[in-house]
Amino acid sequence: MSVALIVSLTVSGALAAWMLIQTLSGGSGASVPRAGEQIDASFAGLRDTSGAALDERALATRYRLVTFGFTACPSVCPLTLMGVHQALEQLGPDAARILPVFVSVDPERDTPRSLSAYVNAFDARIVALTGSPQAVERVARQYRIFFDKRTLDANSGSYAVEHSAFVLLVDPQQRICVAIPSTDPPAQIAARIVRAIRASGAALNGNTAT
């Protein structure tokens, strides 16, 4: 997927998808991620595109910047990852203290190879994770994310995955710093990520928050 094609995706399409997701998740019983909430921010049972599990001990001092989606997502996911990329660029050296993660909610179709190509089209620093449907569902619930597989054609087996769309910034103490709707424009997503990091106590490089 070329960057030019990604940029051509419309915000209106993302908004329509988000409105559908909100309608579905509103009746699902899934909670919405909230700033200040303590969660289990582990990725137990998931693997990166090389087949390795994340070293949870290495995450003890890092912020997690987490999004959920899938490679066939038509509009919301590309716009979200553009925002993540812009935030990492704006943070400069501080970005080294952040682990940007993209968790696939379509483990049946998202292969390690396709996931790797997908996230690298936005930023090579983004770590793509996948696992069994059960493991993905468990981690999604920990992060207060809803997703649902909807059959489009029973004969062909085609389906779509509808999911709640947030960019979640989680601090090293596993508290949600901010939950940003993915329908925000990429530049606004980036600005809110940077602002949240610099407001969560001291800035990553030890400077006072601004």
Each language-model region and where it sits:
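Short, low-complexity, Pro/Ser/Thr/Gly-rich segments in the mature regions of secreted, periplasmic
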Residues: 195-210
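N-terminal targeting signals for export/organelle localization
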Residues: 1-43, 209-210
